[in-house]
Amino acid sequence: MTATASALRMRGISKIFPGVKALSNVNFTVEYGRIHAVVGENGAGKSTLMKILSGSYAPTTGTTEIAGVEVQMRRPADAQKLGIRMVHQELNLVPDLTVAENIYLGRMPHRRFLVDRQAMLRKAAAVLKELEAAIDPKARLGDLPISQQQLVEIAKSYSADPRIIVLDEPTSSLSEHETTALFSILRKMKSQGIAIIYISHRLKEVLDIADDVTILRDGSMIDTRPAAGITAAEMIRLMVGREVANVFPKTPSKIGPVAFKVTGLSDGEKFHDVGFDVRSGEILGLTGLVGAGRTEVAQAIFGLAPLATGRIEINGKAVTIGSPAAAVKAGVAYVPEDRKGDGIVPSMSVRENISLPVLRRLSRLGRIGMSRDRGLAAKYTRDFSIVPPDPERRINLLSGGNQQKAIISRWLAAGPKVLILDEPTRGVDVGAKAEIHRIIGELVAGGMAVVMISSELPEVMGVCDRVVVMRDGRASSPIARGDLTEERIMALATGEEPA
């Protein structure tokens, strides 16, 4: 290592899969003590480049240098030995283990051939304290909200004394306050000389936190610039190869009578006395800080969690929903926040994932009619522009945006009256986000009632007809589209303005 050596220098990196050139002659350099953002649409090559850096893929051509020394990484363990750590968007943790056990999994301290649990707890507590994360190291990981699990994942990487740390969409599950806290952690790491690679679709955050920005498009490196010398609009133009006039277009729709109404919903713990209604042809936004109870309300409406009190009405008639099957029968569909854990079945094809809720309808005498099954999948693959347009492809091989379109297709196949979408554009690029907004717009134009949970305020304000803000398990009165401002939403979410 020389005094002026870069933390990372990848030269001429190409990666060819059968029939696909995922990366083409990419040059990528990252310096110690700097935060380097990588942006691009899904399919631009970000994941492939990071998988090469982390040792999961070998490049077809090209070289990688760490601290001025050329290295070859044939497996993730090789990258880890070189001080490279990855924090994935889809968390790589064990829910049934404690926070401390997750942080030190695979490298727990031992004493006389046994795990030294007290030493492990002390070390975990010290790491969490250094990162200013108020998390009990003895807590079961699965009992924590996703936002705190994300911080545990970061603590796990930080505890390994990394030289280079890669964060993939690290704020996708965090509130604005938690994002600010994370940025404080990243700046502390930066001050310690750690090289940080920051992958995100949230361009405002990229400009807030990054020192440098690299834009990828179609497997090629388009540009690298200081973050201070580029705007979000320029990044979008370079990412997609065109000007994007309106990231959140509002599709006109005819708003009809109340199609869905909830009154006095409470689970006795995480949300209390929640009420709102949605009209046919309307998008009702449900926003607030992470932990405000939005997802818990949606899960209870869909029958995934019990209600202590409350009334649910569809088209003016009270319905009882005690399970997801009962919800689907009543005409309610729910697209969950956690695509990987609760949405897709990774081992199944796109066709099989789309058909799951309607297998009985597609079957005759207990046997599935394959022509009807294939026809249904082909229709949604075509209508929703799922890429690649192959219903037999395993769904886990698709980008996040295309997986999300397949999940939405699944529930539309069930013919719902009400569609609840929980963070539908979380972790997808601008192009996929626009496609998902187009789909939602077409649904409400056709008369469907949509409840959209989102933490992204520009999205809420751009797409929704009315917005309900949740704080500490309670819901505000709905705010009409014309009265929406980011300041008002945040004031309600933080308690600065009474609900």
Swiss-Prot record:
ATP binds at G40, E41, N42, G43, A44, G45, K46, S47. The keyword Repeat applies. CDD domains: ABC_Carb_Monos_I (cd03216), ABC_Carb_Monos_II (cd03215). It is an enzyme of class 7 (translocase). It is a peripheral membrane protein. The keyword Amino-acid biosynthesis does not apply. It is found in: Cell inner membrane. Residues 8-243, 253-497 form the ABC transporter domain. InterPro entries: AAA+_ATPase, ABC_carbohydrate_import_ATPase, ABC_transporter-like_ATP-bd, ABC_transporter-like_CS, P-loop_NTPase. It catalyses: D-ribose(out) + ATP + H2O = D-ribose(in) + ADP + phosphate + H(+); D-galactose(out) + ATP + H2O = D-galactose(in) + ADP + phosphate + H(+). SMART domains: AAA (SM00382). GO terms for cellular component: plasma membrane. GO terms for molecular function: ABC-type D-ribose transporter activity; ATP binding; ATP hydrolysis activity. Its EC number is 7.5.2.11, 7.5.2.7. It holds the Pfam family ABC_tran. PROSITE patterns: ABC_TRANSPORTER_1, ABC_TRANSPORTER_2, MGLA, RBSA. Keywords: ATP-binding, Cell inner membrane, Cell membrane, Membrane, Nucleotide-binding, Repeat, Sugar transport, Translocase, Transport. Belongs to the ABC transporter superfamily. Carbohydrate importer 2 (CUT2) (TC 3.A.1.2) family. Part of an ABC transporter complex involved in carbohydrate import. Could be involved in ribose, galactose and/or methyl galactoside import. Responsible for energy coupling to the transport system. This is Putative ribose/galactose/methyl galactoside import ATP-binding protein 3. It comes from Agrobacterium fabrum (strain C58 / ATCC 33970) (Agrobacterium tumefaciens (strain C58)).
